Amino acid sequence: MQPPRERLVVTGRAGWMGMGRGAGRSALGLWPTLAFLLCSFPAAISPCKILKCNSEFWSATSSGSHAPASDDVPEFCAALRTYALCTRRTARTCRGDLAYHSAVHGIEDLMSQHNCSKDGPTSQPRVRTLPPAGDSQERSDSPEICHYEKSFHKHSAAPNYTHCGLFGDPHLRTFTDHFQTCKVQGAWPLIDNNYLNVQVTNTPVLPGSAATATSKLTIIFKNFQECVDQKVYQAEMDELPSAFADGSKNGGDKHGANSLKITEKVSGQHVEIQAKYIGTTIVVRQVGRYLTFAVRMPEEVVNAVEDRDSQGLYLCLRGCPLNQQIDFQAFRANAESPRRPAAASPSPVVPETFPYETAVAKCKEKLPVEDLYYQACVFDLLTTGDVNFTLAAYYALEDGKMLHSNKDKLHLFERTRELPGAVAAAAAAATTFPLAPQILLGTIPLLVLLPVLW
């Protein structure tokens, strides 16, 4: 049987803060939920300090000289009591915070499972080792396990890398190179695996507008062995930080902390995060008022999920739900047709958009290849009227050039491009039959609609 210490460390890799196989199913089920809630209610924008309590508890139970050794149930209970005390101290500022209330219930559950009394000693604060003289951000003596490629090459062939990106109104390129235009208003998980959680929030471009764009992004790097502490990065409209939520720029105080680094490429516009311990690179940009996201990640990490059935909303892996996808081709066909005169009755507020020809010309300037990035650019100018969306599509393609491992798959094209020709052939065949004129007139609209209904 695995000793408690090892079980704690193993679970640290796979989840948020679960207690390993020794904990009951109810406790293990709590922590993924808590991770999702923490994405939605981050400490960076709230006086509630539950994230600090979570981090301190995990630090106390995952590594270092104060971590519970084998059969150290009393010490583990002491860590739980310290965790409970921390939550009580922040209770006044956490009223109504779902992450806080989930943590409180989780503590009660774990104390019950481990037969911990509510009264008793608490754990001592973790003794942090001082960094060597100089800048603590520049340590380079990371253990091999904290460098994914070195560790991987030792045991097998080079890893296969995949790419996912989100930009514009919003458009999603999945890890499997599917390209979708989605509604997805509100908060949605882009990535949810054993090492990383990424959540985006999309809001209407203007009140009353159907067009949405990414206004908020939260990335949670989970605690990983001797490499990194749990770290949270959050960006919002008009605020692209150059550091994690706790002010640091690397993975914390562990020996391999330098395997997670954040670098500001262009102040307030472009940030890059390198997570070498999982072979991952993330690019976050602010273009105009809105955010774009791009990631390069090994397939092994992409698919590292505990419960595959619970990953239905992992957008980068699964794509957008069907009821959230927009038929981009039908919209374009509508836009290409002559505009009807404005209706006399009042209509909802919509942004002032570009004529189709102008949108095409502006997108051509930045995106000469008429691929799906170009089509996305045209779509965004037609729906938002914001010329910054041209740059969003351009930078999404540039990030793809840097992050995608297969340059032959960089440009994606419409898979149904042959359909209009097929419809024309069907229409020609239909005219060879001696049908009554009124039946033919009824058939033609249906044939025209086939590309939309396909």
Swiss-Prot record:
Disulfide bonds join C146-C227, C164-C316. This is Repulsive guidance molecule A. It is found in: Cell membrane. It comes from Mus musculus. Residues 48-169, 428-454 form a propeptide. The keyword Membrane applies. The gene is Rgma. It is a lipid-anchor; GPI-anchor. Residues 1-47 form the signal peptide. A lipid is attached at A427 (GPI-anchor amidated alanine). Autocatalytically cleaved at low pH; the two chains remain linked via two disulfide bonds.
